[in-house]
């Protein structure tokens, strides 16, 4: 992001960063920037006066997920302390998968810890004629309520654009 820090954005440009719990980044996002690297970039752009947004995705239920996401928002708040967060946004996207994606993941990562058990999910028709597996309604509601509660606790002025 360094080459964008001195651009004349006139306060009209928003940087959106994908963030997740350390567990999800470490186990399911190989080859991506670390949690700390993402936060360092977010601090830089916020310091340059850009609006900030965070896409929490995919929100994944795993053992200890509540603690992991609490720590995510706690550390995010600590790292962004003193920054102008007056127009901070969050987008919340639960883990989902399609049958074709499941096949690819299982072929490329045969030892994955990613739970792709279709019997534990709800089938939802997608916009483009292909269905996807999402968490069941009660699990999705628990995810959404938990994320919104953490955001309200650590970023009371932030706007959650959506949960899907």
Predicted regions and their residues:
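Conserved AdoMet/S-adenosylmethionine-binding subsite of the radical SAM
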Residues: 1-118
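C-terminal accessory extensions appended to soluble enzyme cores
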Residues: 83, 91-164
């Amino acid at each position: 992001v360094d080459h964008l820090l001195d651009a004349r954005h006139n306060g009209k440009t928003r940087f959106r960063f994908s963030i997740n719990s350390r567990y999800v980044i470490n186990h399911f996002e190989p080859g991506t920037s670390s949690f700390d690297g993402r936060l360092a970039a977010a601090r830089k752009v916020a310091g340059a006066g850009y609006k900030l947004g965070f896409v929490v995705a995919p929100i994944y239920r795993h053992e200890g997920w509540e603690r992991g996401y609490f720590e995510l928002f706690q550390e995010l708040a600590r790292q962004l302390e003193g920054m102008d967060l007056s127009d901070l946004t969050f987008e919340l996207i639960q883990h989902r998968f399609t049958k074709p994606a499941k096949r690819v993941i299982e072929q490329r990562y045969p030892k994955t810890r990613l739970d792709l058990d279709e019997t534990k999910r709800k089938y939802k028709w997608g916009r483009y004629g292909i269905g996807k597996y999402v968490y069941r309604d009660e699990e999705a509601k628990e995810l959404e309520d938990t994320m919104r509660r953490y955001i309200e606790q650590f970023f009371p002025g932030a706007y959650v654009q959506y949960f899907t």
